[in-house]
Amino acid sequence: MVVYDLLVSLSKESIDVLRFVEANLAAFNQQYIFFNIQRKNSITTPLLITPQQEKISQIVEFLMDEYNKNNRRPSGPPREQPMHPLLPYQQSPDEQPMMPYQQPPGNDDQPYEQIYHKKHASQQVNTELSDYYQHILALGDEDKGMDSTLKLPERTKRDSDDEDGMFSIKN
């Protein structure tokens, strides 16, 4: 869609040129790459390039130059540091330092202890999560209690409500 909007904004001649390039793009890409490789290797043997292909290569070079002009990075030394330097992590006095995992005492041949410790740790996490969810649910119950005190009064029936009955749809 963006490409279509861009094409509409271009002149008729440019659209024709772009359609021509698009129609011959596959064959052109192969030839253009070969042409660039030969040019970069500074081989002086002339290539058999048709005038059409030469025109296409000029168009593509022009488009690439325009693209590079518009998308050039600002000049200057490359940034080696991020814009906002990272602050070193400071441990608060309340935090306990993280200890490396220590294998429970026992033989390595007994995987039961390892399984038990893993299971115990997951149960502990599950308990903490369930406590957290219970706390959230309790907060939700408090909100429901507050909502019940803020109920709006029932709408009183007006005489004009009876008129609405006259226009009811009957099946």
UniProtKB/Swiss-Prot annotation:
UniProt keyword annotations, A-Z: Late protein, Virion
Expression induction: Expressed in the late phase of the viral replicative cycle.
Region span, Disordered: 68-124, 140-171
Keyword Methyltransferase: no
The keyword DNA repair appears for this protein: no
Basic and acidic residues: compositionally biased ranges: 141-160
Any single GO CC term annotated in Swiss-Prot or TrEMBL for this entry: virion component
Compartments in which it is found: Virion
Homology family: Belongs to the asfivirus H171R family.
Name by which UniProt lists this protein: Uncharacterized protein H171R
Phylogenetic lineage: Viruses, Varidnaviria, Bamfordvirae, Nucleocytoviricota, Pokkesviricetes
